[in-house]
Amino acid sequence: MKRILALTLVLALLLSGCGGKAETQHSQAPAETTVPTEATTEPTTEPTTVPTEPPVYYNPLNGEILDAPFTGRLHGHTISNMAENMPHVNLVKADVVMEMFVNMNNIVRCLALYSDIESVEAIGSTRSTRPIFNDIAQHYSLIVSHAGGSDTALGDANSRGIEHFNIESWDVQEVVTTSYRDKEYHRSLENSLFGIGSGIKAYAQSQGWPMELERDYGFRFAEDGNGTPAAGEYADKISLTFSYKQAKKDTHMVYDRELGKYVWNQYGKEMTDQITGEKEAFTNVILMQTAITNNGIYHAADFVAGGTGYYANGGRIIPITWTCADENSAFEYFTESGEPLLMGQGNTYIAIYPTDSPVTWEGSAPVEETLPAETIPGEAEVSPVEAAAAEDMPEEAAG
């Protein structure tokens, strides 16, 4: 019986094993979930545009602001400066006036530099040119207008290639009217010739001479237009005696505070314009001590050697130095410390004087610089101790 039960049990086990494969359960891995990610965009930095300042253009002779670069030619006009030839006509409209000995030991003349001669109706009185003017013409690339000259002076100008002409010569007058005579002020014949600015420029143009030129004229101007040297000595009156051997000639510059300019005084009187009555006054005054010689007739200057001198503006004066690189370069001016001289916006008088010429000046601080600090009218100054005592005082007592 036990054997039957055992067989039955074995049989049952075999039958259960043949009933099919047991199910295998696969645990499916969950599908990967892709989370969409936003693309990271680096913030775009816009380039910072720094506004560029518009360029500022200046007149190279007077520092005035222009709308465009100055590319014109400068004109130099020869003007008499002897006592019998006063008063001048429109000399003060020149951007730069240079005074110097020119010949025969004691003859002084001026070379007036104009950046816009066309706008000047009359200029004079006009005298003949001299070799020393040829030097300056070469330094500044000038077109020179004059009343003729000696064979020496004219031949020298021609040999250097200087563009120049006699405003009264017939061949010039046939092209355009460049001059007129005026004896109204009892002038002698040689002192009655005057140039016409528009005619002078028109004649220069008719000759095919270059009327545009970009170059350095040596002058530097303060950005704010104020060229007063803060450290300068007070100089209400500046006196220069041009001196060469026995020859003497006095020039005085007197500061006019209302005008803010130096008024030219010579021959014992204040210089005024014949037509307008305007004072001949200058914003800047430069005194150039120069090595000058005389060959028996004409004066000559060694400009390339440079030198020392003085600069005045706004009632103050300082010592300066000046240089000139070569025969074709303009004069350049520096302070004693070697910094470029920054001039005031306006016209300039330049004296080119021999080394033995004395220069003096006198002046004092203007009234507004000597007054004490202003106080409120009618109020006395109160000390800190008095103020503290007043604060502690009972209202009845205070008031």
What are these model-predicted stretches?
Residues 14-17:
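C-terminal motif of bacterial Sec signal peptides marking the signal peptidase cleavage site
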Residues 27, 32-52, 375:
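Extracellular mucin-like PTS domains
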Residues 19-22:
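Bacterial signal peptide processing site
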Residues 380-399:
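Long, low-complexity, intrinsically disordered segments
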Residues 1-9:
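Positively charged n-region of N-terminal signal peptides that target proteins for export
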Residues 50-98, 104-380, 398:
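A surface/extracellular/periplasmic glyco- and lipid-processing/surface-interacting theme
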Residues 10-11, 387:
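Short, linear, compositionally biased motifs with a strong N-terminal bias
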